[in-house]
């Protein structure tokens, strides 16, 4: 039961509306060493919108601000000015407890390095966000975790530890872990950087599956033009500014404007 006066976590609808806005950035700026002679602004007034149906690539040269932006969106850091809204709720005024709850329930993270806990089984790693949030998982949650392992192609691997899995299999566990809370937004930072092309394609297909079936918006940082071209839209970050937000042609030959550019 929630604490009196405490808002519930932001969670996606079980029957999702693909047009629901998941993320909105309004004139977001980020500076370091504020007020000092060494102050430097790394993000310059960014505006961006993502809907549940969006599957977007975030591209840009090293040092363009991609990781900084992902940290802000993922509530791992706060902007110097501007506002970030998740499912319509402003995040800059959230206290630490609220930010932690939202981050744990509404945002999924997948990184280049999977960061699995070596002493835990694959299933225990998948259930870790639920363990952190509420203690011992229920039988229903364990069944959901096993279902996710099956979804990512690891049926029968629940009791294996990371050192008994290949690199690609470990990354699949990380994907299942990111999705166990049914987040409204999935942030993926170079998730296929250490994988061979076949495994990278498999991981990408998993992201696409959850985007379409569960209305989980995806923002994927990648340096691989082959992968970014398969996303619905590509957001280009140059020297801390969004310089392009373009729709990619769909397989059916139609092109939709990215939601960030829709009225």
Residue ranges and their predicted role:
Residues 1-31, 244-263:
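ABC-family P-loop ATPase nucleotide-binding domain
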Residues 21-230, 234-237:
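ABC family nucleotide-binding domain
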């Amino acid at each position: 039961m929630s604490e009196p006066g405490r808002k519930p976590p932001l969670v996606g609808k079980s029957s999702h509306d693909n047009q629901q806005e998941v993320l909105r950035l309004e004139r977001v700026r980020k500076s370091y060493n504020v007020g000092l002679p060494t102050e430097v602004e790394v993000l310059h007034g960014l505006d961006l919108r993502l809907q549940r149906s969006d599957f977007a690539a975030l591209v840009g040269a090293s040092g363009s601000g991609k990781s900084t932006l992902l940290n802000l969106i993922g509530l791992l850091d706060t902007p110097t000015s501007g506002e970030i809204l998740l499912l319509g709720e402003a995040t800059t005024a959230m206290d630490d407890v609220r930010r932690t709850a939202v981050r744990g329930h509404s945002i999924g993270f997948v990184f280049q390095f999977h960061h699995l806990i070596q002493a835990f089984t694959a299933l225990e790693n998948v259930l870790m966000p639920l363990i952190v949030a509420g203690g011992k998982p229920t039988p229903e949650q364990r069944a959901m975790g096993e279902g996710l392992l099956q979804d990512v192609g690891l049926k029968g691997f629940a009791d294996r530890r990371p050192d008994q899995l290949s690199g690609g299999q470990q990354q699949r566990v990380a994907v299942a872990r990111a999705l166990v809370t049914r987040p409204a937004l999935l942030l993926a930072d170079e998730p296929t950087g250490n994988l061979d092309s076949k495994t990278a394609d498999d991981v990408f297909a998993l992201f696409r599956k959850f985007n379409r079936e569960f209305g989980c918006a995806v923002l994927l940082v990648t340096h691989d033009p082959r992968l970014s071209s398969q996303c619905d839209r590509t957001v280009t970050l140059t020297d801390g500014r969004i310089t392009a937000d373009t729709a990619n042609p769909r397989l059916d030959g139609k092109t939709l404007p990215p939601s960030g550019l829709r009225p």
